[in-house]
Amino acid sequence: MLMITSFANPRVAQAFVDYMATQGVILTIQQHNQSDIWLADESQAERVRVELARFIENPGDPRYLAASWQSGQTNSGLRYRRFPFLATLRERAGPVTWIVMLACVLVYIAMSLIGDQTVMVWLAWPFDPVLKFEVWRYFTHIFMHFSLMHILFNLLWWWYLGGAVEKRLGSGKLIVITVISALLSGYVQQKFSGPWFGGLSGVVYALMGYVWLRGERDPQSGIYLQRGLIIFALLWIVAGWFDWFGMSMANGAHIAGLIVGLAMAFVDTLNARKRT
């Protein structure tokens, strides 16, 4: 199987698939963050790419609009649900993605009800030498958030990036990225600011770095991040470093997380190339 391209609009993807069916080429659509087009017979790849270039130039051409009828498919296979937003949330996130989101929400509720300090005493990075053997503390800091905007921003990125990694590469890969980046970004951040910090952003930056570089070096992995978004991430690090917006940011965790993600993607793509 070879991934040809992705479309943000599922109906556009279906139009191209239907047209290629009339040309004797069978493509399939897999719905993830976008509608991914896959080709089973890789010997037809060059032909498909030529037709794709023509399609992108003029997707409204009548031959494409009529393709569903010619291929005998009057039903695109799309299903419209009463709550499409909730359906999208479910479809684009695996169990690990959901478990982490739920943990963050529950911890945020607890912090709102009984106070930040009470929760941090149990979940923060070890703040006393006698706590260094409480191993969970090296990871549970990622569940603590200190404002509604803080948790919403992090969970949105976690769902978008973590969900894509889990759906494409499996729950194990997401767990490995999360555990390593939580540990290393937390270690760096406590060197910067001490143990009283929290948030999922170090892991989010690791996912940004991983998804972007993995997509650039290994397009067949099926994950990618637009270059504009990685530029935004870098600008956000700069803004936090120079305190442009007067907000307290975990700059050490952000930088460490990004480096961890890039390093892991580099290693994984090296291994992928050795196998091919």
Swiss-Prot record:
Active site: 201, 254
Reactions the enzyme catalyzes: Cleaves type-1 transmembrane domains using a catalytic dyad composed of serine and histidine that are contributed by different transmembrane domains
Family annotation (Pfam families): Rhomboid (PF01694), Rhomboid_N (PF12122)
GO CC annotation terms, alphabetical: plasma membrane
Record keywords, A-Z: Cell inner membrane, Cell membrane, Hydrolase, Membrane, Protease, Serine protease, Transmembrane, Transmembrane helix
InterPro entries tied to this protein: GlpG_N_sf, Peptidase_S54_GlpG_N, Peptidase_S54_rhomboid_dom, Rhomboid-like_sf, Rhomboid_protease_GlpG
Superkingdom of this protein's organism: Bacteria
Any one biological process term the GO annotation gives: proteolysis
Annotated TM spans: 94-114, 142-162, 169-189, 192-212, 229-249, 250-270
Membrane topology classification: Multi-pass membrane protein
Enzyme nomenclature, EC number: 3.4.21.105
Places the protein is found: Cell inner membrane
MF annotations from Gene Ontology: serine-type endopeptidase activity
Family named by the database record: Belongs to the peptidase S54 family.
Task of the protein: Rhomboid-type serine protease that catalyzes intramembrane proteolysis.
Listed name of the protein: Rhomboid protease GlpG
